[in-house]
Amino acid sequence: MAGGAITPDSLIGLIAEINEIPGNFGLFKKDCSDLARRVGLLTHLIEEIRDSSPPSESDASSSLNSHECDWWSDLVVGLQAAKRLLSSATSFQARESSDGAAKRISFQFQCVTWKLEKALGDLTYDRYDISDEVREQVELARLQLRRAMQRYGSLNSKKFSSGLSEPMEKDASSNRKVIEKLESIPETVHSLSDEKKFESPPPWKSSSVSLAFFLSKDGDDERLEKAVTENSDDSQKSDNLTIPEDFLCPISLELMKDPAIVSTGQTYERSFIQRWIDCGNLSCPKTQQKLENFTLTPNYVLRSLISQWCTKHNIEQPGGYMNGRTKNSDGSFRDLSGDMSAIRALVCKLSSQSIEDRRTAVSEIRSLSKRSTDNRILIAEAGAIPVLVKLLTSDGDTETQENAVTCILNLSIYEHNKELIMLAGAVTSIVLVLRAGSMEARENAAATLFSLSLADENKIIIGASGAIMALVDLLQYGSVRGKKDAATALFNLCIYQGNKGRAVRAGIVKPLVKMLTDSSSERMADEALTILSVLASNQVAKTAILRANAIPPLIDCLQKDQPRNRENAAAILLCLCKRDTEKLISIGRLGAVVPLMELSRDGTERAKRKANSLLELLRKSSRKLGSL
């Protein structure tokens, strides 16, 4: 089950613990009771997921499994944050706390609400045997969470303007030495407000606010817990070690890997504060002061202190590379300063006035980025990504463009680099390559979009960029490899509900249905069925699939195709024919009953469920006709 060590049973127990938290009779009484009630609605969902057979594994479902893991992890994180928040809010004393403390708790309610709504929105019901009653409960919970998000609105609420003015007494910090070091940072570091900003900040989704786990001043160990741990020994050490508060991003409460200073002098993890700003917030999250500008200045002093602290406590350093060293699998460190010097020299050549120098440098970086994760980390650390993005639009230099987009593809394999690529505004340039580049460049552009779209928030950005229409064009007219790359990217993008309508409007359905009847050696029925199975849950897509006369080829797939394809064909037919007696009669006349009965006996667990559901609907429609 996705989510690592967090099983459905343990999650049910967590929900029970949340519901057992004593009710609050103070300022946050309604917030606490509302959140606990919404969480309680999820019990039956987790129980049915627990009782469902796990989805079958196959090559075509690898991306879907990744998505499944993402939504489950989001749910786990959201529920754990909800428990911590309710425990904090119920013990909140207005008279003993500052206005800022109340605002932080209000901000946490907003963040936890968003996280839970996002997790439920990403749930794909067809992956599990979820009853209609439970679906209605989940949709009710989502509706309530969305309404709550609208109610919380701006963080500059006047709700706490009275009765909360007494200052919070500062506890003696166990990390005073660290704080003193930070306070001694020269003012020049804070005044670097003229540093160049990213030219194209990403249009992060308007409703997204990064999750604030717990913005209390207490250095408790609970906020260090991880839903999934890669190594039990390392996990045990982390649980027993309190990270200095100044090393944690005030928004995410995670150890910072790229600390950046805003105009108020506060430091945040760059990606989180960038998302905060992109959501339209004009104030500093911690101080609520208005930001004079949106320049994010690197805090190199704090980054160095974090590196030293990680080394001292034998903790893996965020970002994988700091101060010229990278951590090996055995826990030892390897010096990469020599490699870094060579890579920096190559990155400098990327901006050379000489076309030949640029071509040579980008070709070498392409080769290096293909070889190892260390190289991908170093190349990104050397600042190559923004320069490579500029090279994507090299006029008339096809070779440089091909190598640049391939470099970005290779770099995106490393998870942290995905974020840097998005922050560099790469999507717009990648889409331009996808539309007008050479075939090799278009293939690699499609593969890059797939890689970037593995992060849920990126699905939204890529979908809004015009990429889907360009991918559909490649799906129809590209090379064999280009078609497969386009299909993979389209499948992943269409997992997000908002992109399904875009794909239909871009004309995706007709080429997919055509692929079902293609008898050539380049047949892509597997890819077509996988994408159609994702689209079919959308009403606009469902109408388009029916208009494309997809039912006959789908029934053919039921009769003679591979097990995975038969499973997807049954799932699509169920979506198309549910609550439509006319369509049920049609598939019965076209010979669907016999292959469905075979599938209900011999298919995968998911295929059996879909086949049995269709057969039951066929029986009901037959009895209904007989009674007329």
From Swiss-Prot:
Pfam families: Arm, PUB10_N, U-box. Pathway: Protein modification; protein ubiquitination. It is an enzyme of class 2 (transferase). Its EC number is 2.3.2.27. It catalyses: S-ubiquitinyl-[E2 ubiquitin-conjugating enzyme]-L-cysteine + [acceptor protein]-L-lysine = [E2 ubiquitin-conjugating enzyme]-L-cysteine + N(6)-ubiquitinyl-[acceptor protein]-L-lysine. ARM repeats lie at residues 373-413, 415-454, 456-495, 497-537, 539-578. GO terms for molecular function: ubiquitin-protein transferase activity. PROSITE patterns: ARM_REPEAT, U_BOX. Residues 242-316 form the U-box domain. The keyword Repeat applies. One of its GO terms (cellular component) is nucleus. InterPro entries: ARM-like, ARM-type_fold, Armadillo, RING-Ubox_PUB, Ubox_domain, Znf_RING/FYVE/PHD. The keyword Membrane does not apply. GO terms for biological process: protein autoubiquitination; protein destabilization; protein ubiquitination; regulation of jasmonic acid mediated signaling pathway. Keywords: Repeat, Transferase, Ubl conjugation pathway. Functions as an E3 ubiquitin ligase. This is U-box domain-containing protein 10. It comes from Arabidopsis thaliana.
